[in-house]
């Protein structure tokens, strides 16, 4: 249980301040356009669109900006064709890194990712080289809430696990197949999560020292900052004492 909490804190600790707000919004717009093109503009029938819109709103993106992005996707006003491409590699101390991207130019994207890995002591590898070190699963986070009610609704809906943390937050863990059903069931029961996503959780972690952490953070920040990057996952274990120095 503690491991999952640590993983989530590491992945989201720096949050929005890692990247300029304009770049974050540009990425949301791209994801909204693609989700709309793929599943339609009716949010009730398109869980992927609902997810990205929720994330955009949580980042304080304006509703009219979101609506314009949906319009661009539904009316084919954006003529670019995007591919979902995953890149895998290694950071310092053998840490495993996954970079999920949305790109309209694979050559540009791989060149930028390779440059980031090389600049900060990493190595871009081949497909499948590190993904086996992670488990794909659904993650639903409640910063506060009625633990008993959340547990009852989530488990009845098919959740794999419920994790309660010392700070009062509650994590609901699901399979990828059941994620949207369980999330919608919780929302219908008026249990609104503060954050939810389908993510990649490391099976094991690699502990980093202060020296390695500095270059590792520069690497992951550089990867996150790329225009084509959607998500960056890793299995680094960075202590609270070290992370507070950055």
From Swiss-Prot:
Transmembrane segments: none annotated. Gene3D superfamilies: 1.10.10.200, 3.30.70.980. HAMAP family: Transcrip_reg_TACO1. This is Probable transcriptional regulatory protein COSY_0365. InterPro entries: Integrase-like_N, TACO1_YebC-like_2nd/3rd_dom, TACO1_YebC_N, Transcrip_reg_TACO1-like, Transcrip_reg_TACO1-like_dom3, YebC-like. Keywords: Cytoplasm, DNA-binding, Transcription, Transcription regulation. The lineage of its organism: Bacteria, Pseudomonadati, Pseudomonadota, Gammaproteobacteria, Candidatus Pseudothioglobaceae. The keyword tRNA-binding does not apply.
């Amino acid at each position: 249980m503690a491991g999952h909490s640590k993983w989530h804190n590491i992945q989201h600790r720096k949050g929005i301040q890692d990247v300029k707000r304009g770049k974050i919004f540009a990425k949301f717009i791209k994801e909204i356009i693609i989700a709309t093109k793929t599943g339609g503009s009716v949010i009730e029938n398109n869980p992927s669109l609902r997810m990205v819109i929720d994330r955009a709103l949580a980042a304080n993106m304006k509703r009219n900006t979101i609506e314009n992005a949906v319009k661009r996707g539904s009316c084919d006003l954006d003529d670019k064709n995007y591919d979902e491409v995953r890149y895998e590699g290694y950071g310092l101390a053998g840490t495993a890194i996954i970079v999920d991207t949305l790109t309209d130019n694979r050559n540009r994207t791989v060149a930028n990712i390779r440059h980031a890995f090389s600049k900060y002591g990493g190595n871009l590898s081949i497909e499948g080289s590190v993904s086996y070190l992670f488990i794909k699963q659904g993650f639903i986070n409640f910063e506060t809430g009625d633990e008993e009610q959340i547990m009852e609704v989530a488990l009845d809906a098919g959740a794999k696990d419920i994790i309660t943390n010392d700070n009062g937050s509650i994590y609901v863990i699901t399979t990828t197949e059941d994620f949207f059903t369980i999330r919608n069931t919780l929302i219908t029961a008026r249990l609104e999560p503060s954050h939810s996503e389908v993510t990649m959780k490391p099976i094991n972690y690699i502990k980093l020292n202060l020296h390695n952490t500095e270059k590792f953070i520069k690497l992951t920040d550089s990867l996150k900052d790329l225009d084509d990057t959607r998500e960056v996952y890793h299995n680094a274990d960075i202590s609270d004492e070290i992370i507070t120095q950055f």
